[in-house]
Amino acid sequence: MFKAIVGASTLQDALDSVSVLVDECKIRLNEGELAIRAVDPANVGMVDLALDTAAFESYTADDGVIGVNLSKLEDFIGMASGDQLVELELDEETRKLNIQMDGLSSTLALIDPDSIRQEPDIPDLDLAAEIMLEGAQLDRGIKAADMVSDHVRLRVASDTEAYHIEAEGDTDDVDFRLDTDDLIALTAGEADSLFSLDYLKDMNKAIPKDAEVTIELGQEFPVKVHYGIAEGYGEITYMLAPRIQSD
């Protein structure tokens, strides 16, 4: 069974974090949290979402799994304003999700979870550098890089203790540097990796500008990007594979 009441903005923030990478996903309706883990079709970008029951007005679940079309679900939730409450209830006989908000009722046909891509394992990586910054700072760096290139270098030099978002185009270059005083926190270690800017742009769309974002970075390793939603009761982690440069 599954029945929950949650603020529309909380649910939208959670779904946005996943829909930037995939069109459909499994939602695990655990007793203690709602959880989603998914990887994009190219196996380049991954998302892991955990939304604690404390983020809901009410929440009852018995560890079920449903499959959803994210675009359709977001369309339904988008009918509510941010401060409205959305009521969700699973009809186990029809395998449909009943959605109610402010006088509006709708039903969403679910997808067989077995037909959806298997949830990925998130590797335990030993990444040398950890950067904590504001979502607005990350947004500025990504937008600057996008002006000149389709890939971006994320780099920390342990000697200067600065975080760089760099891009090199055919004729133009960008270097957005954030020193220790500009950041919320920095654990400096040698870290330098190149990434597809398209994926980072998509992930960046979901990250609130006022969020505290933690980035874990290594030498030609995947990058992990963490941020919270729902007043800290929700945690989102992205992982993005690097573009390996040949010598």
Curated annotation (Swiss-Prot):
InterPro entries: DNA_clamp_sf, Pr_cel_nuc_antig, Pr_cel_nuc_antig_C, Pr_cel_nuc_antig_N. One of its GO terms (biological process) is leading strand elongation. The keyword S-adenosyl-L-methionine does not apply. The keyword DNA-binding applies. GO terms for molecular function: DNA binding; DNA polymerase processivity factor activity. Keywords: DNA replication, DNA-binding. Pfam families: PCNA_C (PF02747), PCNA_N (PF00705). Gene3D superfamilies: 3.70.10.10. Homotrimer. The subunits circularize to form a toroid; DNA passes through its center. Replication factor C (RFC) is required to load the toroid on the DNA. Sliding clamp subunit that acts as a moving platform for DNA processing. Responsible for tethering the catalytic subunit of DNA polymerase and other proteins to DNA during high-speed replication. Belongs to the PCNA family. This is DNA polymerase sliding clamp. The lineage of its organism: Archaea, Methanobacteriati, Methanobacteriota, Stenosarchaea group, Halobacteria.
